[in-house]
């Protein structure tokens, strides 16, 4: 039976710009917003868009990501006609090969894709924060009779040189693609979200592999090749909130925007929920000295200090006399007595010892997973 569309989430990136936060886990597994991991947004968008089959392509440090996704039940992807598959590099008769790029990762999983037998494939990045109805994008793809549709976001002209830019005609057909141009001709930036007719893409990838023609990356190789061949390639304009959280600064900004009064992500919209693995935790405890304002405090936290405009993830502790301002404290992290944290991201399980000060006024500071800053006490 042919399935209409299969989603493939590219989640194998190392995320070196996130420094200590990705030394032991893949970037899509990094926590966000107190309760979620970054990949939850792509998975939830799939679930909310009615996509029942999802492949998650992993490579770098996949254990935490695999454990988080499990059988996909948190996103309703564990039914008879639905499922989530973890796709990792494997040894074949011709030898071992790591994924060499985004499109090469798809080529390496052709057998899996063929087993699902989709008419279309939706290619997603697992490390962006946004809400999007992929079904609406698919309808646009069909209406345009496109071979490829690229989701684009209008960005300020001064920032356009950081992105792959799509130049389009009056009907939004893409006539030129420029990778990070010094003098951009438009402000339509690729979001790294693509819908392909599967058989067309399959044929191209197989032919490129046989002829040893480099076709490892969608932005650098596949899109330019489609345009060169005269394929119908269209832009799908997206106007909602979207954030690439590939740096410490952007991850911190996205978390702060998440708790802002405006909340552009519209996280409280019950019609488009973001789902995640539900870990059962005890209620929060606020001690006699606790002072919390303008903050998001998730289940299982212990607070006996001051928390302002910050996020405390599951099981975080802020002990007596400690102050946390404009910061993200990830799960299980401990902020010791009298410690002061400002504009920082404290990784899962980290310990900030009593009296330690971390000031990110000039540059957002980061403490890695299970890292100890200062001298830990027996209580920690």
Swiss-Prot record:
GO MF entries: ATP binding; glucose-1-phosphate adenylyltransferase activity
Family of the protein in this entry: Belongs to the bacterial/plant glucose-1-phosphate adenylyltransferase family.
InterPro entries (UniProt xref): ADP-Glc_PPase, ADP_Glu_pyroP_CS, GlgC_bac, GlmU/GlgC-like_hexapep, NTP_transferase_dom, Nucleotide-diphossugar_trans, Trimer_LpxA-like_sf
Enzyme Commission number, as recorded: 2.7.7.27
Record flagged with keyword DNA-binding: no
Function field: Involved in the biosynthesis of ADP-glucose, a building block required for the elongation reactions to produce glycogen. Catalyzes the reaction between ATP and alpha-D-glucose 1-phosphate (G1P) to produce pyrophosphate and ADP-Glc.
Pathway stated in the Swiss-Prot or TrEMBL entry: Glycan biosynthesis; glycogen biosynthesis
GO annotation (BP), single: glycogen biosynthetic process
HAMAP family xrefs: GlgC
The protein's assembly and partners: Homotetramer.
Annotated protein name in UniProt: Glucose-1-phosphate adenylyltransferase
UniProt key word S-adenosyl-L-methionine: no
Keyword vocabulary terms for this entry: ATP-binding, Carbohydrate metabolism, Glycogen biosynthesis, Glycogen metabolism, Nucleotide-binding, Nucleotidyltransferase, Transferase
Pfam families: Hexapep_GlmU, NTP_transferase
Catalytically driven reaction(s): alpha-D-glucose 1-phosphate + ATP + H(+) = ADP-alpha-D-glucose + diphosphate
Signal peptide: none
């Amino acid at each position: 039976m042919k399935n209409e569309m299969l989603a493939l989430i590219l989640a194998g990136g190392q995320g070196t710009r996130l420094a200590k936060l990705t030394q032991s886990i893949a970037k899509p597994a990094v926590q966000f917003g107190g309760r979620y991991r970054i990949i939850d947004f792509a998975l939830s968008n799939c679930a909310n868009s009615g996509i029942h089959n999802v492949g998650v392509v992993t490579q770098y440090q996949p254990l935490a990501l695999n454990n988080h996704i499990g059988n996909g039940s948190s996103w309703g992807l564990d039914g008879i006609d639905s499922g989530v598959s973890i796709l990792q590099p494997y040894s074949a008769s011709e030898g071992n090969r790591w994924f060499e790029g985004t499109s090469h990762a798809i080529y390496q999983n052709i057998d899996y894709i063929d087993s699902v037998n989709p008419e279309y494939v939706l290619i997603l990045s697992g490390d962006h924060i946004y809400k999007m109805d992929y079904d609406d994008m698919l309808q646009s793809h069909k209406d345009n009779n496109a071979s490829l549709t690229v989701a684009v976001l209008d960005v300020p002209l001064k920032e356009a040189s950081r992105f792959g830019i799509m130049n389009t005609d009056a009907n939004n057909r893409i006539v030129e693609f420029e990778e990070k141009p010094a003098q951009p001709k438009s402000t339509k930036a690729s979001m790294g979200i693509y819908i392909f007719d599967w058989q067309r893409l399959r044929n191209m990838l197989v032919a490129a592999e046989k002829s040893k023609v480099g076709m490892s990356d969608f932005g650098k190789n596949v899109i330019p090749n489609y345009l060169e061949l005269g394929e119908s390639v269209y832009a799908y304009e997206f106007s909602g909130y979207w954030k690439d959280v590939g740096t410490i600064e952007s991850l911190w900004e996205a978390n702060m925007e998440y708790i802002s009064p405006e909340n552009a992500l519209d996280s409280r919209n019950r019609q488009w929920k973001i789902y995640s693995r539900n870990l059962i935790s005890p209620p929060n405890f606020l001690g006699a000295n606790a002072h919390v304002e303008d903050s998001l405090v998730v289940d299982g936290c212990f607070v006996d200090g001051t928390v302002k405009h910050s996020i405390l993830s599951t099981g975080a502790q802020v002990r007596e006399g400690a102050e946390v301002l404009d910061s993200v404290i990830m799960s299980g992290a401990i902020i010791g007595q009298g410690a002061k944290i400002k504009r920082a991201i404290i990784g899962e399980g980290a310990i900030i010892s009593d009296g330690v000060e971390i000031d990110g006024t000039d540059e957002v500071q980061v403490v890695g997973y299970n890292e100890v800053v200062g001298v830990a006490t027996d209580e920690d």
